Amino acid sequence: MVDFCLNQVQAKEKMMKIIKGRKENWEKEAEKVCHDFDMFCEYLLEKKVKLSKGSGNIGKKACFELNSFFTVKEDFEKPTRLQKDYPVINFFYFFAVSKGILEQDPKGNYMQPGCNYRCYKEAEVLERFLLLLMDVLFDGRFSNDSAWSGLSMEYLMNWAEKKRPCANKSYALPENISVRLCMTGRDNLMTYLEELGVLTLRLKEGQKYLLPIERQWKMEIKPLFELVCNLYSTVHKEYDEEKEDLAFFCFD
């Protein structure tokens, strides 16, 4: 992952200008994402989920149940996996703690509301979504493959700039990402972007029973993909303040 050195206040101000024109459309999509994270927090707080004494992580049974709530689910049949095996849970956990939304109680047994819990809950939905998105794009410490996630994001953004994809249409997955997905069975960045409602990954028809290395993937671009590209561009490229329309996309 790249070092996110741009002042977050400046990034937020620029993004709010970009968001202004399409706020209503993006808000509906972002609400779904924030709902998953809200369920994550509420589950830990209301059920007083016991944390591991050594790592402070969520236990296997709780992870298994949490997994069933989210948009992107891991296909595990029994509660035998650790928190690190659930990319979405691992991300939500890191985000909640690093942003002071949740914190461990003094004894380290449970989660309790953090110093920023109320501020987060009172923020507008797009502000909350942008915070989640910034961690996926520019931090990556929660990921088991943060170096690969950074490369995959670069490949994806370069592809978007050349392809100029349209929302709600499907495209072949960029080759660099497709090769990694076929060889390893997963690309965590794609998992995070799916959970954030940015895109949807699907196997091409008739390929379900092929060997992983032989499979071909396609992705459906969602409306929030445009917001991702604009945020990425704001941070990584020189941004001309007079050009407020950075969109690469066509909306019919």
Task: For every predicted segment, state its role.
Residues 1-91, 117:
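Short, amphipathic alpha-helical interface elements at domain boundaries
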Residues 2-9, 92-111:
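Short N-terminal secondary-structure initiator segments
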Residues 15-18, 29, 161, 173, ...:
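Interaction-mediating elements
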Residues 24-60, 121-165:
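Short alpha-helical segments that sit at the start of domains
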Residues 47-80, 147-181, 205-206:
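Short acidic, hydrophobic short linear motifs in intrinsically disordered regions
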Residues 82-98, 179-204:
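Short amphipathic alpha-helical interaction segments
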Residues 103-144, 200-251:
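Accessory beta->alpha helical hairpin/"wing" motif in late/C-terminal subdomains of nucleic-acid enzymes
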